[in-house]
Amino acid sequence: MKYDQWKMTRRIEEDFLKSLNFLSTLFEKIAIISGNDVKAFQNKMQTFQNSVPYDNYINDIVKRMVTPLAARNYETWRKAARVSTRSHFLYTVLMEELKQGIKKDIDSQIISNAALIKTLPSDTAQKVVRDIEEYALSGLRVEEIEKLIQDKTRQHSRASARLIARTEVSKTTSALTKARSEELGLRWYVWRTMEDGDRVRKSHRIMNDVLVSWNNPPSPELLVKEKDVGRYHAGNIWNCRCYSEPLIDIDDVKWPHKVYINGSIQKMSKARFSLLI
């Protein structure tokens, strides 16, 4: 059974991007007041990164991203469990276990996401400085340095904001689903793509509708003979909107079904798969 509500909502990603772009605007203002002084720009960005208001802001925007994701994830679990679970008793137990794990999961994701965003000012500054050093070899006038600092700050900060918003919303969703699956003893999920046509990577397209064990993340790139970028679960790599659909009941999928096992995708019967769970 394919339950579409596991699919990630774009609204949370868009709201998170707006919050990150506000930081980009502040970085651009720091670049303007720094003029052509690269060292002053670096120092100001580092000072901003170490400030209490910055800490408060990133914790706030991360909380506003993680909390609705966790709420949606819980609601999706509740509905999927009701559809998949034939026993009312089992459904009740499932819901109780989910409730107990929610706060811990939310707190964990807030901490990890805030840590990632924390270094955004210094990371942006370092990229700008590297660009300035490269351009300096060709000889730059003072006014060109000033404009370059501003342009590169905008370019790098906006690009980072887009990457973080897309990647971290997806990774947070994946982490929440994985944590709750493990709490409930559910070891398998179905890898789903967002079905964006040509926008889906070839390596991810081959993983669509494949059963994957949480204990054995695949290396999709190796399956299509591309450069290996490591082993990871659905939605757990940069610029990926794939998502995991937990296998709550073995009859939630049609058999025989594709299964990732021993580094390859195999068509497997229900009886054979039953030996793995």
Q: Predicted regions: what is each one?
A:
Residues 1-156, 247-277:
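N-terminal leader/targeting and assembly helices and adjacent pre-domain segments
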Residues 155, 159-260:
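Acidic, glycine-rich two-metal-ion catalytic cores of nucleic acid-processing enzymes
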